[in-house]
Amino acid sequence: TTVANFRQLDMAHGGQGAPLAPAFHKELFLSDNQTVAVINLGGIANITWLSEDSVIGYDVGPASCLMDGWVMRHQSQPYDDQGQWAASGQVVDPLLADLLQEPFLHLPGPKSTGRELFNLQWLDEHLAGTNYLPEDIQRTLLQFTVECIKLGFKQVGQIVDQVVVCGGGTHNRQLMLTLAEAFEAPCQSSAAFGVDPDFVEATLMAWMAERHMAG
């Protein structure tokens, strides 16, 4: 038996087809008497807010997609290993402020986005007429990811007790360090909870299929 078309089913029931993970995050990470925020760092960053009486989840902006595209353009590498290139640069505050004006970031949730918006063409439009160093742009893109996540937290408007991070972005050491500095609550990879950060979404698909078959 093959179970598929999860995103289409979500849209048929009034959703946006993404993110699909919040219900699974609840199964994995909800803790008694604690509010837990789960950050998934794929190409796009999404957050799930878990408390005893609610589950909130939506996309908040780019995670790795812009950084991966930029390092491929300038260093012919598929990703910035450990965030080392970003760590060699400095945040360009005027550029960061400009990127944060993107209207999507200020829409209320639930919402979803993707590479159809956050891509190198979008970035190039913001860089037109500037002459910033490539490594400084990479560092600014990393900070932009963190600021998008912080803005998402602010929009939820609740105090969080624990931050759990999953997805490929957990391997970006500079990104994880910057995230940890951004929040007062402890911020850890899902690996600390016995969940491989690289396989959360793959396991999600198996979990949804099992739930579907069980009725």
Model-derived regions: residue spans:
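Phosphate-binding/catalytic loop of phosphoryl-transfer enzymes
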Residues: 6-78
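Glycine-rich phosphate-binding loops at beta-strand->alpha-helix junctions
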Residues: 160-180
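Conserved ATP-utilizing enzyme core subdomain
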Residues: 56-146, 150, 212
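Glycine-rich phosphate-binding/hydrolytic loop that grips phosphoryl groups
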Residues: 143, 188-215
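Phosphate/pyrophosphate-binding loops at sites that engage ATP/ADP/AMP, CoA/4′-phosphopantetheine
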Residues: 130, 150-161
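Non-transmembrane, aqueous-exposed alpha-helical and coiled segments at domain scale
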Residues: 137, 152-156, 179, 189, ...
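Generic structural signal for well-ordered alpha-helical scaffold segments
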Residues: 25-30, 143-154, 210
